[in-house]
């Protein structure tokens, strides 16, 4: 995917270099005159609080109260009009206007202000008042330059239009785009909501290793590194699952972790090699309990982040307030295949040769290492991913996955070959994956052996055999349910973001050309 728009014209680059040179000269003069970057100003108020408390007062009421404030922020608007000037500053909460004139601020201070630039950090001390137009402002009796900006901000009309620059220079994006700031505030609120609800449900938050001697807990290709002191190969974790289940073995019956995972795979609008997940495990629960609990978590996160569970995503309504539907893989294929221009009978979905032919028509390679020796369950899953997955707009649990693609999930007591597993899809994206955990050490060891066979046959994403995890299970693990929720994709839903890079502060990009 190419995020680049047209490069800036040469004249714009020349103009920017000229502006930077001028600002460096101003900074040099500041250094000559004393402390160029003072660090002794402490604000007493934030912009949002001033507006909340005093916007409703009339000009006369505000003047009578004589509210004295100290405020600081980045100058994002400047108007010089002879003996009076206005500046709008932006702090972490919002914006407020400064009023500067010769009489109140002093002619020398006002004169110095005229040479300050957009992007500079400035502080003001003075009384609140309202202009003739009714705008709440600070009448500056004391005004200072706190930090000089050497680079010009993008102009407010064109903004930051180049997507790669937006992602690479997120600091500029956050300065000039309130939408981006709101996105990451919503992300923070959503994560805080998840954490709060986990703690309220008596889960304990833990931290497990990021460097693993054996990659495990998911089927994915890991990043590889080397531990110099121990002289051993290590892997950035692809999932914390096996460590969290070790903690359940150890007696922590409800645990969760919010942290990074790393998978050495492709980059796309819905994939970033470094991503955030929340995984949680609860003893004496199963996948049905997990589905109910996860549904409540996501609904609460939406309300806490955006104030409602009924959202708009990419121009369509997304209602998280209604019960999430639950379908098996085959039920989903039959229900949604028409939206991919297909029509199937239920009996056809038990025909491996038929499914292989359909996969080939859809551009898939049925002879790939993943599918070459696949059983009917894995083939059905591949067909689901081809013709149904992208059409699951409303929240949908796909349940009862085949055992051959679920090496860590408990097998159903009544349906051999089927596991008690679900994946949650919303707007055609996988958001969560959970299951009743396999706690039979001998069964788990046999499944690891089959994974090793698949890896030896060319499947790079197949799991390794983790002997220590088997040893942990041999001490006994209670019946347990576990689930992982993709935080980045969840935030995409909550903030109407079309690309996962829009919700990650510093997404992965190609190396910048010097």
Swiss-Prot record:
Listed GO biological process terms: lysyl-tRNA aminoacylation
Cofactor(s) this protein cannot do without: Mg(2+)
GO MF, any single term: ATP binding
Entry's cofactor comment: Binds 3 Mg(2+) ions per subunit.
Gene3D superfamilies: Bira Bifunctional Protein, Domain 2 (3.30.930.10), Nucleic acid-binding proteins (2.40.50.140)
PROSITE patterns named in the record: AA_TRNA_LIGASE_II
EC top class, as a word: ligase
Keywords per UniProt: Aminoacyl-tRNA synthetase, ATP-binding, Cytoplasm, Ligase, Magnesium, Metal-binding, Nucleotide-binding, Protein biosynthesis
Sites where the protein binds Mg(2+) 2: 430
Any one annotated GO CC term: cytosol
Pfam family membership, one: tRNA_anti-codon
Catalyzed chemical reaction(s): tRNA(Lys) + L-lysine + ATP = L-lysyl-tRNA(Lys) + AMP + diphosphate
Disulfide partners: none
EC number: 6.1.1.6
Residues given in the record as Mg(2+) 1 binding sites: 423, 430
SUPFAM superfamilies: Class II aaRS and biotin synthetases (SSF55681), Nucleic acid-binding proteins (SSF50249)
Domain of life: Bacteria
Places the protein is found: Cytoplasm
Subunit description: Homodimer.
Similarity remark: Belongs to the class-II aminoacyl-tRNA synthetase family.
Protein name as annotated: Lysine--tRNA ligase
Organism, as annotated: Polynucleobacter asymbioticus (strain DSM 18221 / CIP 109841 / QLW-P1DMWA-1)
Underlying gene: lysS
């Amino acid at each position: 995917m190419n995020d680049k728009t047209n490069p800036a014209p040469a004249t714009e680059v020349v103009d920017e270099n000229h502006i930077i040179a001028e600002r460096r000269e101003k900074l040099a003069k500041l250094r000559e005159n004393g402390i160029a970057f003072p660090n002794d100003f402490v604000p007493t108020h934030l912009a949002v609080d001033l507006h909340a408390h005093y916007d409703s007062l009339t000009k006369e009421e505000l003047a009578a109260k004589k509210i004295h404030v100290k405020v600081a922020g980045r100058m994002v608007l400047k108007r010089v009009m002879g003996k009076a000037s206005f500046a709008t500053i932006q702090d972490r909460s919002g914006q407020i206007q400064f009023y500067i004139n010769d009489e109140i601020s002093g002619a020398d201070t006002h004169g110095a202000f005229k040479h300050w630039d957009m992007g500079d950090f400035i502080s003001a001390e003075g009384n609140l008042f309202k202009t003739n137009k009714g705008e709440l402002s600070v009448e500056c009796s004391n005004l200072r330059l706190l930090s000089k900006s050497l680079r010009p901000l993008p102009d407010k009309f064109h903004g930051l239009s180049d997507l790669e620059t937006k992602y690479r220079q997120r600091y500029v994006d956050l300065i000039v785009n309130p939408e981006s700031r709101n996105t990451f505030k919503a992300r923070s609120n959503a994560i805080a909501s998840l954490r709060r609800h986990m703690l309220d449900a008596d889960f304990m938050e833990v931290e497990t290793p990021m460097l693993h001697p054996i990659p495990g807990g998911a089927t994915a290709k890991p990043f590889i590194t080397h531990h110099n002191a121990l002289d051993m190969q290590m892997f950035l974790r692809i999932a914390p699952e096996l460590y969290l289940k070790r903690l359940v073995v150890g007696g922590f019956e409800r645990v969760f972790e919010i942290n990074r995972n790393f998978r050495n795979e492709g980059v796309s609008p819905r994939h970033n090699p470094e991503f955030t997940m929340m995984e949680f495990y609860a003893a004496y629960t199963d996948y049905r309990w997990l589905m109910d609990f996860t549904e409540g978590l996501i609904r609460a996160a939406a309300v806490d982040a955006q104030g409602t569970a009924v959202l708009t995503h990419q121009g369509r309504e997304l209602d998280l307030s209604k019960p999430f539907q639950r379908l098996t893989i085959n039920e989903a294929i039959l229900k949604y295949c028409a939206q991919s221009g297909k029509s199937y009978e239920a009996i056809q979905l038990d025909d491996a040769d038929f499914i292989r032919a359909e996969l080939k028509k859809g551009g898939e390679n049925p002879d790939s290492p993943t599918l070459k020796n696949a059983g009917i369950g894995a083939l059905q899953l591949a067909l689901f991913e081809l013709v149904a997955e992208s059409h699951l707009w409303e929240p949908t649990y796909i349940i009862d996955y085949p055992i051959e693609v679920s090496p860590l999930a408990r097998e159903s007591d009544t349906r051999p070959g089927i596991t008690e597993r679900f994946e949650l899809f919303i707007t055609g994206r996988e958001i969560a994956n959970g299951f009743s955990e396999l706690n039979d050490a001998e069964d788990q060891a046999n499944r690891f052996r089959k994974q090793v066979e698949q890896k030896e046959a060319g499947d790079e994403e197949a799991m390794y055999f983790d002997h220590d995890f088997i040893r942990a299970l041999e001490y006994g693990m209670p019946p347990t349910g576990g689930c992982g929720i993709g935080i980045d994709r969840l935030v995409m839903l909550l903030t109407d973001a079309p690309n996962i890079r829009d919700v990650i502060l510093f997404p992965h990009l190609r190396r910048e050309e010097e």
